[in-house]
Swiss-Prot record:
Residues 57-69 have a biased composition (Basic residues). It comes from the Eukaryota. Residues 8-19, 37-49 have a biased composition (Low complexity). Component of the COMPASS (Set1C) complex that specifically mono-, di- and trimethylates histone H3 to form H3K4me1/2/3, which subsequently plays a role in telomere length maintenance and transcription elongation regulation. Controls the production of several secondary metabolites, including gliotoxin, but does not contribute to pathogenicity. This is COMPASS component cclA. Gene3D superfamilies: 2.60.120.920. Keywords: Chromosome, Nucleus, Telomere. GO terms for molecular function: transcription cis-regulatory region binding. Component of the COMPASS complex. It comes from Aspergillus fumigatus (strain ATCC MYA-4609 / CBS 101355 / FGSC A1100 / Af293).
Length: 618
């Protein structure tokens, strides 16, 4: 069947009527086409006008779709704007949070009843100061835990006096205020008493194991390896062959501060650098010392921090602070007292021969990160102040300050109105990720505050004294009349706070779960076929079913807390029989009436239970 095409049509002709070319011949359309096979097409427009002008108008290029959308010229193709999904903030205040269900654990091992062993030290280098005429040996801590990746680590010990939570807080030697082994990077080296630190490469920071939350606290730092002192007579030949002695920075830092940088690189630290005595905060250096004066080897730098009472601090972060009613924060902290609900969401685990706690650490907030890297002096979210309504992390503490002394001489107060740190100004990282999304992110574990911090670079070394005997000594009172105390006194206070918090956790666990009836825990139904607790993120999320222990269903509640009298007896005996000086948690809780440690006998296992084994982490 042949196709029929009207005459004058512009469409192609049928393949049947089209001639075929033999192979090897020239293309068909290279010559003149006969009228029979010619294709009809409309006549092209006349080009006479174009040829006479000699020029051709430039074609206008059409804007791209993105440009048209930006100019608002192509409204039809603009996709509809998505509604911003506001994530509901389910975080609860620390005062409204209760203890999490203790994990289902095997019975403590005999070794769990013993305190943690001293850290193993490996010799690295020796620093000698010609100005001071002393030498210091520095060691690397072998196989140490480091606070990172959103988690913080501490040490635990099994105690039969705590049948519900089974373990309580403890620490590793040396038992005094010092630099923390866990709160420092691996590049930091310690002296044997952990009061002196150094680093051989880039900037690294070490934080102490004591923090200031309210009141006036003081510590001293002496440079043992740094900028040479003017009294050191060095010839030209000696100076050319003399190795650099490094640099140091001193100050205070919060737990959110980066330890792989120098103190003051962000909004979470306040420091002073040895070169020219410049003060540093959020990467901004400002002149502070007189011109030509620096911090040199042998100099003693005193750091005094003053913080308002926690009662005023809470009003600032809650947004209820009124200076006309609450004052300006200059009144001594002894005039105002407040109750604090310490929430420590911890997971116990074995690490080699030790038993440790793992808990969420605080993380830096977006507002302060943006402010630290903002080149403008006025941040996008408004200037930091006690009344900043954008975010609690941008609020500052009235009456707070940091004063710096050099060799006993007061140099001035470079930092005032320090950033608030109580939750929700500080937020805990979640167990699943570091976004801090969850109802327990505002929990206060009692160790959120400002820590003494020292940064070292290229071999710089610093020795600190957190309590007497001092090299120089602090003033008797701060500018607001607050009595000045050595921050090392916080060591014993933190032990007492840990002991009280452990007792409160045990009593709360006894009252809430001591008389479990059926499969209902705290008015929340749990699957009767539950296989016990699961660790990690499910427990930190606060799920009742995640930490439910079905073994306690058949155990009478009264039989479980028959040994709770040991708590008060051990506490009383530890306080009366402890030696003068520093206390330890073992002195407070594990010392009997005769002054000897309690025997390492594990508590009696529960009836009708199947012993399980904990998974060791290495």
């Amino acid at each position: 069947m042949s196709s029929i095409q009207p005459v004058g049509s512009s469409g192609p002709s049928s393949n049947i009527n089209s001639p075929t070319l033999p192979p090897g011949t020239a293309p068909f359309f290279s010559g003149t086409v006969t009228g029979q096979n010619a294709r009809s097409s409309p006549a092209p427009p006349s080009n006479a006008s174009v040829q006479t002008d000699g020029t051709r108008s430039k074609r206008n290029k059409r804007d791209s779709r993105k440009k048209r959308e930006a100019k608002g010229l192509d409204q039809e193709s603009i996709p509809p704007k998505k509604k911003a999904a506001v994530a509901p903030n389910s975080a609860l205040p620390s005062s409204d949070i209760s203890i999490l269900r203790p994990l289902l654990l095997a019975e403590p091992r005999a070794s769990d009843l013993l305190p943690p062993q001293p850290r193993q030290l490996s010799f690295v280098s020796r620093k000698t100061s010609d100005v001071l005429g002393q030498s210091w040996d520095f060691y690397e801590v072998v196989d140490k835990l480091t606070n990172k990746n959103g988690f913080r680590y501490s040490y635990a010990i099994a105690d039969p006096g705590f049948p519900h939570i089974k373990y309580r807080q403890t620490d590793v030697p040396p038992y005094h205020a010092r630099f923390s082994f866990e709160d420092s990077p691996a590049a930091i080296f310690f002296s044997e008493d952990a009061r002196a630190v150094t680093a051989s490469s880039a900037w690294h920071t070490a934080r102490a194991n004591v923090c200031a939350r309210e009141g006036a606290y003081y510590y001293e730092a002496r440079v043992i390896n740094g900028i040479p002192n003017n009294s050191q007579s060095i010839s030209a030949n000696e100076s050319s062959h003399r190795t650099p002695k490094g640099h140091v920075r001193l100050g205070f830092a919060r737990r959110e501060a980066d330890l792989d940088a120098n103190v003051g690189v962000d909004c979470y630290g306040y420091g002073i650098r040895d070169v020219n005595g410049e003060v540093v905060n959020r990467m901004r250096c400002e002149y502070f010392f007189p011109k030509g004066e620096s911090i040199r080897e042998g100099d003693v730098i005193g750091m005094l921090i003053t913080l308002p009472p926690l009662s005023l601090h809470k009003k600032v972060v809650e947004g209820t602070y009124d200076p006309a009613v609450d004052g300006d924060g200059t009144s001594p902290t002894s005039e105002a007292h407040t109750s604090t609900n310490l929430i420590r969401d911890r997971i116990p685990f074995h690490y080699k021969s030790d038993f440790c706690w793992q808990q969420s650490n605080v993380f830096s907030t977006k507002h302060l990160r943006d402010y630290a890297f903002n080149l403008k002096e006025t941040p996008t979210f408004g200037p930091p102040s006690p009344f900043n309504s954008e975010d609690p992390s941008l609020r500052t503490l009235p009456g707070s300050s940091i004063t710096i002394f050099k060799n006993g001489e007061k140099m001035g107060t470079p930092f005032k109105e320090l950033y608030a740190f109580l939750p929700p100004a500080s937020r805990l990282a979640n167990g699943t990720n570091n976004l801090g999304i969850g109802e327990r992110e505002n929990a206060d574990d009692g160790m959120i505050g400002y820590y003494p911090a020292v940064s070292c670079y290229g071999g710089g070394a610093v020795e600190c004294r957190f309590e007497g005997p001092w090299w120089v000594g602090p003033p008797s009172h701060a500018d607001n009349g607050e009595p000045v105390r050595g921050i090392g006194e916080r060591f014993n206070e933190q032990i007492v706070e840990d002991v009280v918090a452990d007792i409160v956790d045990e009593v709360e666990a006894m009252l809430i779960w001591g008389g479990v009836d059926g499969d209902v825990v705290g008015n929340a139904e749990v699957d009767s076929a539950g296989a016990g607790a699961v660790g990690g993120s499910e427990v930190l999320k606060g799920g009742v079913g995640a930490a439910f222990d079905p073994r306690l269903d058949s155990v009478p509640g009264a039989a479980e807390f028959a040994d709770t009298e040991n708590i008060s007896n051990g506490l009383e005996a530890g306080v009366t029989d402890a030696d003068a000086g520093h206390l330890t948690t073992e002195d407070t809780l594990s010392v009997g009436h005769e002054g000897s440690p309690n025997p390492a006998t594990p508590s009696a296992p529960l009836e009708n239970t199947v012993p399980t084994e904990d998974v060791e982490m290495s």
